[in-house]
Amino acid sequence: MKRAFLYSLMLLAIFVNGVSAQGDKPSPQLKSAIDNLEKTIVTKPGLVPLGSLATLDLQPGSCFVPPESTREFMTALGNKFSGEILGMIIPGSKDEWALDIMIVLESSPSGHILDADANKLDANVILESIRSRTEAANVERKKLNQGELKVLGWDEPPYYDQPKRLLVWSINTVDFDNAASINYNQNMLGRDTLLRMVALGRVDNSKIKQFAKKAATHISYNPGKRYEDYQPGVDKVAEYGLAALIAGVAAKKLGFFALLFALLVKGW
C-alpha cells in the first residue's frame, strides 16, 4: 500500500514538474528520493533529535522523515530552502503511513526575536502586506511559467502563546486551478533561532490543524537553545518583531509550499 501510494505521488509530481527525458516517467531524482524516504522513515515512538537545536518526542500515530530524506524529497519536487531542514512529521505507524498530512520542520538563524508587539498584532494590516508580497511573487512565478497563488484571507488570524513562545497563523489560499488549501504555520521562538512548523494536506482542515497542534506540543528546544536562555549583549537581536515576521515568512512560505501541495493533493 505504501509503495502504491508513493507511485501515485510520483505520477502527480510529473504533472507539477514535467516529465523526464524518457517522456512519460518521473525523474531518477524523484525515484531516488521516494526510495530513500521509504527506507529511512522512523516509525518507532520515542525521542528524535532535531539536529542540536530541539527534540521531538515522536508519538504513536506519527512517523518522522529524517532531514536528509525530507530535503531530497522536497528538492526533487522543485522546492528550494532558505533555512535548515530538520525533518518532516506525517501520520501513520510501522504498518501503514501516508502523506495526506505533512508537517515540514525548518529552522532559521533569525536572531533573538523580541515579542514586545505581541499585543499589537493588526491582522488586517498584516494580511494586506502578505497579499501585496504574494502578488509581487506571482509576477516572478509567471516568468517561471508557474501558476499564481491567491490569498483569500485568514483561516486563523495570528495569535501568540506567550508562555510557549509560539506564534501561530493559518491562511486560506487558492491556486491557479482553483484548488483551495490552508497553510498552517506554527513558529516556536528560541534563543537565537526560529523553528518553523508548516502543515499542509488533503484532508479536512480541522484534521490538519489537530495533527499539527498535537505534534507541536511534543517538540521542545534543547537546554541552552530556549527563548529564556537569551543572553543580552552576547546574542544577536533580530531586526524585526512578530508582525514583520508573520508578513515576511507567510508570503515566502505560501509560494514555497502551498502552491506545490495544492497541485500534489489532487487525486490522492
List the predicted regions and their residue ranges:
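Bacterial N-terminal signal peptides
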Residues: 7-16
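Positively charged n-region of N-terminal signal peptides that target proteins for export
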Residues: 1-4
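N-terminal targeting sequences that direct proteins away from the cytosol to non-cytosolic compartments
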Residues: 20-268
